[in-house]
Design a protein with these regions (language model features):
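Conserved Rossmann-fold cofactor-binding substructure of NAD(P)-dependent oxidoreductases
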Residues: 43-62
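Hydrophobic alpha-helical packing elements
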Residues: 53, 57, 78, 268-271
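A hydrophobic C-terminal alpha-helical subdomain
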Residues: 219-275
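Compositionally biased, intrinsically disordered low-complexity regions
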Residues: 53, 59, 154, 192, ...
Length: 275
């Protein structure tokens, strides 16, 4: 079995590549810039960029971790082209980092991209495993503005965020035993569903800052982000994260992390304590 990992210079892909290397598992690192690839034992490096011909880099690969590409209007087309390349190269199994509630009607707009990618994988003829990640707990401190506020139209909704470390551990488990996990869709969450008031309080305790959650209407959310200089689609996607929380799409706790890895999922306090 030959395993390949995309995004090996990133957070999830990097953790997966390192864990496999430490176990002595040969891994092919698929990266945009080979010069930035981590130097790990038992690894080889091949250039691969979503949106370009990746079939040569995938030749001989049997099992593949496909870390979703960067957010962009072209992401769905790039994912579909990459899946076509993987099938053409003879890849047998793809483990894909998706998102909770992925599908055409998801409140979180970028989860619709993931739904489209899942559909392409199911139709590809390759075996697949979907890792539907919740919000990364590691990223929640970035939601705090300079004024100490988390702002958005999330109402009283909750999120069951997951640690990046846990996503990587699940991915490693699936890659090492792909047949056991074939055709499975896993919901990867932490052990608790938190409202944004609770998230703000946890970040405040961990950082010593005064952090609060400010409920916004959709219109207020658009106005408060007007100075970001971001494209309209990106602002809409950011705001829809909060809308998905308000609608309850991100608030369901799953035990899949512990069931798959045998270890309890990390909670927000643990993640913040190691940040």
């Amino acid at each position: 079995m030959t395993i390949a990992v995309t995004g090996a210079t990133g957070r999830v892909g990097g953790l997966v590549a390192r864990a496999l290397s430490e176990q002595g598992v040969p891994v092919r690192l698929l990266v945009r810039d080979p010069r930035r690839a981590p130097e790990l034992a038992a690894t080889t490096v091949a250039p691969a960029v979503y949106g370009h011909d990746c079939a040569p880099a995938l030749e001989g690969v049997t099992t593949l971790l496909m870390v979703s590409g960067s957010e962009s209007p072209d992401r769905v087309a790039e994912h579909r082209a990459f899946i076509d390349d993987a099938a053409e190269a003879g890849v047998e199994h793809v483990v894909y980092t998706s998102f909770v509630a992925a599908g055409p009607d998801a409140a979180f707009l970028l989860a619709r991209d993931h739904g489209d990618t899942e559909e392409a994988l199911r139709a590809s003829g390759m075996r697949w495993t979907m890792l539907r990640n919740n919000i990364y707990l590691d990223d929640l401190p970035r939601w705090v503005g300079e004024d100490g506020a988390i702002r958005g139209p999330a109402g009283d909704g909750h999120l069951a965020g997951v640690a990046i470390d846990d996503v990587a551990r699940v991915a490693v488990t699936a890659l090492l035993d792909p047949r056991r996990h074939a055709g499975r869709t896993y919901e990867l969450t932490g052990p608790e569903a938190l409202g944004l008031d609770e998230v703000a309080a946890a970040i405040g305790r961990a950082t010593g800052r005064a952090v609060r959650y400010v409920r916004e209407t959709h219109e207020e959310a658009v106005a408060s982000r007007a100075g970001y200089g971001a494209a309209d689609w990106q602002v809409a996607a950011w705001i829809s994260t909060y809308t998905a929380i308000e609608r309850g799409e991100l608030g369901v706790v799953s035990g899949d992390v512990e069931r798959i890895t045998g270890q309890p999922a990390l909670d927000l306090a643990s993640v913040l304590g190691h940040a």
